[in-house]
Amino acid sequence: MSLASVFNIAGSGMSAQTTRLNTVASNIANAETVSSSIDQTYRARHPVFATMFQGGQSGGSDSLFQNQDAAGQGVQVLGVVEDQSNLEARYEPNHPAANEKGYVYYPNVNVVEEMADMISASRSFQTNAEMMNTAKKIGRASCRERVYGEC
């Protein structure tokens, strides 16, 4: 594996974690928004990732088992999907956003889970950044060794 591959893999990981962090931020920002209808209520969003393989093939866990000789080349974001779990309906007839039956709908966002996901994404981003810095140090040491004969 070349250093360029390490940079590509770490860079794709950082990009994926940035998407994850942005999605978490959006979920937290909308956690307390309300609506008078189910259709207009914010639903939690989650990114979907896939491994990129040498030769451009990508896929989820099924393709990992189909081609065990393929070397991973990074991660890509396939998209962001809405969580289809139930929304919370509260009977609050005095709420300004209540519908004609007195119900207000709250998003299906669990702030505690989102905070844990944010910490995980942040640490993953940091790990990828450290991997890039380590590869950069190895590259510099390799260049010095070739140019100056240093060890």
Locate the predicted segments by residue.
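Positively charged, low-complexity/disordered segments
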Residues: 145-151
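Amphipathic alpha-helical polymerization modules
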Residues: 1-144
